[in-house]
């Protein structure tokens, strides 16, 4: 049950959540807003309250007492470390367990202890059999009866151990699955609560890496590995107890190995912890790069930036790889040293035991074997579980990082129930002397004493240059951020005193870059208001001019729109976002460039709807297209964070100030044909202007003629020679695409396929395998030495001859220890190099091939970026199991098994046959189980939506918070993760069967080999010495099977992961190889020739139905038309994100599918509708895909894009970090950087898809002038809904319903008074 005082528990039963113990109280207005500076407020804050200034890492350093205790408890990992957070304790890993989980943990622990305690019985029973062999005549019935008693004990223990091991594995795996589900839920829940300032400092890629990589490390640490660890420690303690029971002197002597072993393990843990933390940092940064690149893959492709992004990704992975290799070194060094000390003490124990036997303190040699074998088994298994200890250490370090996020309670907490909820909202908004700077950019002040009053029911428009603080003001009103000084109030109440959820429900916002989610249109609208009916949805969609296009979708309102709304155009997305806001019926409406992506007709309809929706409510608008705000009650002009002009449209125009300059910048050319027939001669121009105008008219006429020729071609196209050529070309390309699609099935990968991809590492693998095989000869060597020792105890009386044999045994055991030390060190380092190289190669190859895929690949919901990022984060590390320390254990085991089988055949072939048969039987069972688990893994991955949803949440958390739907998305994540949880539990059952069989296998092996061996000795077929050597050999072979089988789940997972990655690595894009094709000189003539096209995900909904238009070299062609008419698709096809499905698209007369895609894109430059920047400096973003660009050229491009003015105000200039996705820049600033990125390439074809939509009028005019200069001598295709920016185009093409409806220049189309004319009249700002 949830705690009574926890109304927002969300099903989390753990009352230790600080955020549920207390909540942030309403904070009164302060001149300088630091809650901790006011003692009254500070006393009410949660213990783990933080603000953005508190997020700097606070280094943890253990005290002297802690260091001593850490070393004493084998926790040297934190004995001398300075870490950002203290690694959590082992119990702390289960802090989110519930009562049932603790019950499972208790039962599993009991079973693990029972299983561990039972292991020394093996030594005890073996000792009793040894006594029977040495004391009684081998052919006597007394020998046979005594020996057979122990056989039945082996059988009974084997059955008992198999049951306890099954229960142990199931309990730990079930508990782990449930605890990890809770931990993931809490992590996502906590991410949803964090404030905007935290996200400015914590990139979404790093958060995603935590969710995938760090969580996986914790899962590995608290699952079956913990059971194995507990079993190992129980085995060690039980072994010590048994040894002390039989002979305390010998046991005490052998216990001397403990301090040295503890020191080894502590030093190992210390080194592993520090290197793991450094490794995680590199992996996290690489994850951020991968996430950004895949989320903005079209931008990366358009600028041929694939290899640059791959280079950045690889560089960060390389940093982590170096530390991972060091982990292999330390593991091998200290692990080998452990075994050296163990075997040295083992030899000394045999020597001392022989001495005690000689002097009569020990009466039978079997007791020596019991004590020595007990201590050996305990210590040996402790050494073998050292890799599991490293896994546990990794889990503790990762958990510390995860818990920091989970425990963080921000000052602006969307889950807080505190704060006022005003009953009768009037809607008076006031900004009073507001100062603000972003937490991540303390050196740049955005608002500098803003004073603004918005009276109830009025509309106020904010205008000004990009980056002047307009959107920041909106962020302060919605409490994404808080001012550093001053107050923001609603109806006289400081927004900091209001309940956040109530505030954001009261204030509805349409953001500059609309965010939609990977769901149906219906569900996206429900996010706005979960209680809405379909009738209400249809009503608001009609208001937002969205209903008509939605009805034309394949499933109407139930159509899936893909990741980020990829199936919709920019204008369609914005209309759905507007409808989603209107359905909330907010009291205060914030419109941040709400209609920037709409065509003029849609904008007029939607603006009218917004004007109607604004009636009776306070509305704050931000718009660069001034026609949308001319009806506002008040227009305020921002500059440098303060208001410099205010008034309505007419007042500000009469004032003739800055606003008037913006209006003039957006006025259209005078239209002399508005009331009379058009005559070119009557236009009064000077000679120069007339010459220029005639040139423009000639160009326009050529374009119009081309359009008319295109229309006539449409009528008789099927019979033309060019049509036949286009059809033949399409048939060839269609056949190629069909072949690619046929190859795009599921690729099944085997272990050999993984090794085939290890080119360049074969020498390391060979040498590593050689050393691993040498390391694997340890158990056969021990079998021979034990057989040799057994013979020594037959030297009766026990005297000098026996002691000499034991002295030689000391040397033999120490020699094996030295061999193990050096072979383990060498093999561990070599395989660490191979595993990290291979994992990095798979990551890089997968990432590289993803960046080269065509757009249709990403349109497929199965290939949503969220899912692909999860695959990159988890599959490549999973493959490492085949080539890292786990593979070493298997090689050790294989070498030991083969060598022990050989020894058994040499000394007793009957035992050899029996043991080999048992091992093969177990192998067949394991293969069957592996196949079953592999199928379950594939099914689980294919059905896993939880990872995609989590990434969608992380990417769009600010939007989710503003919509007050944190809990809705959290519920969605919880629901989707239940399927994953069920799959894990089913898979755990199969893995538990495997674990049970392999861990009890040694007892069954001993049972059957001793049963047959006793019979052989009794019948006199073999001597007891040879039979004993054969049995010991097979026993140690069974130990090898048991040791290696625990890695069985990881190997199955590696095979599944390899198949998933190979599907990515070997997939060929439909657009073909980037470098193949012709590379002619591009002049810039473009022809859309009867082009037909449908998106692959919507084949029955054609976008182009015989589209025909031409752009001649050096022309500027503007594409206009309703949102969703296919304008951006035209540009996407020129960039070859998609290929035509009918007709042909030609550049300079050649089908672009025959051109090298790399060459084609080097001749083009694209400025997209939603400019995508990447983490890094402004310089790096401008030069994306280019090498060695001179600084002068970069500055020239930035100046052309009108970016130099705001750059001058940045302390680091062009070396300023723009933040993740350019988050540190305003929308207009981002767009200017994107324009500079295009201009620096000096392209032959310039593609501008709403290139100036986020710019203020003055910046737009300056940038437009720059673009006008930049397009001289090159072909320019531009899309713009702000028609003032395209009126000087040589040709304007109006596209609707998949065809060209009108074409001509501005004057010609105005003369026609058709569709274009109507759009112009809607945006006319004539004064």
Swiss-Prot record:
Annotated ATP binding sites: 464-471, 1121-1128
Q: Which UniProt keywords apply?
A: ATP-binding, Cell membrane, Membrane, Nucleotide-binding, Repeat, Translocase, Transmembrane, Transmembrane helix
Q: What is its EC number?
A: 7.6.-.-
A GO cellular component annotation in the UniProt record = apical plasma membrane
Basic and acidic residues bias locations: 1-17
Spans within the Extracellular topological domain: 126-151, 247, 353-364, 790-805, 908-910, 1018-1030
Primary residence:
membrane
All residue ranges annotated as the ABC transporter domain in the record: 429-665, 1086-1322
Q: Where is the composition biased (Low complexity)?
A: 694-704
Q: In which tissues has expression of this protein been reported?
A: Expressed in pharyngeal epithelial cells that surround the anterior pharyngeal cuticle. Shares same expression pattern as sms-5.
Under the heading SUPFAM superfamilies, the entry gives: ABC transporter transmembrane region, P-loop containing nucleoside triphosphate hydrolases
Coiled coil regions in record: none
| MF terms in GO | ABC-type transporter activity; ATP binding; ATP hydrolysis activity; ATPase-coupled transmembrane transporter activity
All ranges on the Cytoplasmic side of the membrane: 1-104, 173-225, 269-331, 386-766, 827-886, 932-996, 1052-1327
The record's family statement is: Belongs to the ABC transporter superfamily. ABCB family. Multidrug resistance exporter (TC 3.A.1.201) subfamily.
What is the name of the protein in this document? P-glycoprotein 14
